[in-house]
């Protein structure tokens, strides 16, 4: 009797503690508990840095030595004058260009969909602005170098330069897609490479959880109830994918990575959970995201900003409206208005006399755009701080639960 009462009292105690832990996790945010969240975040980062520093010093000391020698050699090249300086500066520009676009790709794919949407913020506008400038100037050789793109706190040199400084137009009517695509292809592929690299952390974390006999939280919660028609349908599709995820292979991963969709967030977790080979997952993700998906998005942006698409829309509208009674007589006037709007939109840069007003408008637009970017950065940083603090708190809660469970087990054994 005594043992039965103790056993029955053990379960409510653990269940109550779990409910309390869940409530504490939900309350731990920067808005509700900012000081506690920041404190746990700082502690978690400190422990993470200390653990990895100890690991690096103990296991890969040769790598640290090599990196130190490389950094010292690079610093020596930068500080010393000579004919090598221009080559070092050029190499620095290429390195900054590559790291910038790869970093934007990583920032876009990490966080299981909550990352920065850098295609909308940077790559998409860059391709659109370059295409519009190409259509205005009638030539594609606008860049001073491959790295002459949008970067942090730096605009490309061709953006505000008038078309007459580039020379006379090479293309009279329209610039073909095959000529525009190579000019923006490298930065697009680098961005796609970053998105593929951003899918690796979920894969490794899920694989480690699978090898230890655990299960990722994202796989457990994706089948939960969600309000809203779209959320329910997306969760149904995710549940279907999970039920068939043991059949994942190179081609299914490639298809999921190639098509822009919100479902690939779980691909890395599923492949890690079912212990798919790393190179099979990474190569399929790399080809799908850095080659196929990137080119689909880039070609779409170029076509939208290219007047060839406007010509096609105009011709299709004229063809369709010609069959509508009453519109045949109004088609010439409508066509003239459409062409006037297109020429006004794609006309070359205005004279220098009105350049001051344009720069003022550009400055205000840039200020608003930078404000939006900084707000998204702050939101992204807040999500990182909150998730890190919650993960650290959950680890402490699991240790507390394990201690309580072990204590209850010892008490039960003694009562026998």
Swiss-Prot record:
Domain of life from the UniProt record: Eukaryota
Membrane topology: Multi-pass membrane protein
Cellular location(s): Endoplasmic reticulum membrane
Signal peptide feature range: none
Claim: Metal-binding is one of the keywords in the record: no
Lumenal membrane side: 81-100, 271-281, 337-364
Cytoplasmic compartment segments: 2-59, 124-249, 305-315, 386-416
Keywords per UniProt: Acetylation, Endoplasmic reticulum, ER-Golgi transport, Membrane, Transmembrane, Transmembrane helix, Transport
A GO CC annotation given for this chain: endoplasmic reticulum membrane
Biological process, per Gene Ontology: endomembrane system organization; vesicle-mediated transport
Modified residues annotated as N-acetylglycine in this record: 2
Amino-acid biosynthesis among keywords: no
Membrane-spanning parts: 60-80, 101-123, 250-270, 282-304, 316-336, 365-385
Role this protein plays: Involved in the early secretory pathway. Required for the correct export of secretory products from the endoplasmic reticulum (ER) and involved in the maintenance of ER integrity.
Protein family membership: Belongs to the VMP1 family.
Protein name: Vacuole membrane protein KMS2
């Amino acid at each position: 009797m005594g043992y039965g009462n103790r056993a029955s009292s053990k379960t409510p105690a653990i269940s109550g503690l779990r409910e309390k832990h869940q409530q504490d996790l939900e309350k731990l945010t920067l808005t509700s508990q900012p000081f506690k969240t920041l404190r746990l975040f700082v502690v978690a980062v400190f422990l993470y840095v200390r653990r990895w520093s100890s690991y690096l010093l103990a296991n890969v000391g040769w790598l640290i030595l090599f990196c130190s020698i490389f950094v010292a050699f690079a610093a020596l090249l930068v500080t010393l004058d000579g004919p090598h300086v221009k080559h070092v500066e050029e190499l620095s520009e290429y390195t900054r260009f590559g790291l910038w676009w790869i970093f934007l790709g990583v920032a876009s794919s990490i966080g299981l969909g909550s990352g920065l949407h850098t295609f909308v913020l940077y790559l998409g506008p860059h391709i659109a602005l370059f295409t519009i400038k190409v259509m205005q100037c009638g030539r594609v050789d606008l860049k001073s170098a491959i790295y002459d793109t949008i970067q942090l706190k730096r605009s490309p040199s061709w953006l505000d330069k008038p078309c007459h400084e580039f020379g006379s137009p090479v293309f009279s009517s329209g610039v073909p897609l095959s000529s525009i695509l190579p000019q923006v292809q490298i930065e697009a592929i680098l961005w796609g490479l970053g998105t593929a690299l951003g899918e690796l952390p979920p894969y490794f974390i899920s694989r480690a959880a699978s090898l230890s006999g655990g299960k990722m939280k994202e796989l457990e919660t994706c089948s939960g109830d969600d309000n809203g028609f779209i959320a329910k349908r997306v969760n149904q599709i995710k549940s279907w994918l999970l039920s068939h995820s043991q059949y994942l292979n190179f081609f299914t991963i490639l298809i999921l990575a190639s098509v822009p969709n919100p479902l690939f967030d779980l691909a890395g977790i599923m492949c890690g959970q079912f212990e798919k080979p790393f190179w099979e997952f990474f190569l399929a993700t790399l080809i799908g995201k850095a080659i196929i998906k990137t080119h689909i998005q880039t070609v779409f942006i170029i076509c939208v900003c290219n007047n060839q698409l406007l010509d096609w829309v105009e011709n299709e509208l004229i063809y369709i409206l010609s069959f509508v009674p009453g519109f045949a007589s109004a088609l010439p006037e409508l066509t003239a208005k459409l062409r006037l709007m297109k020429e006004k939109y794609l006309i070359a840069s205005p004279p220098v006399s009105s350049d001051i007003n344009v720069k003022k408008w550009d400055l205000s637009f840039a200020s608003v755009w930078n404000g939006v970017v900084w707000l998204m950065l702050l939101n992204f940083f807040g999500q990182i701080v909150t998730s890190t603090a919650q993960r650290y708190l959950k680890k402490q809660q699991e240790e507390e639960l394990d201690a309580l469970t072990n204590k209850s087990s010892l008490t039960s054994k003694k009562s026998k």
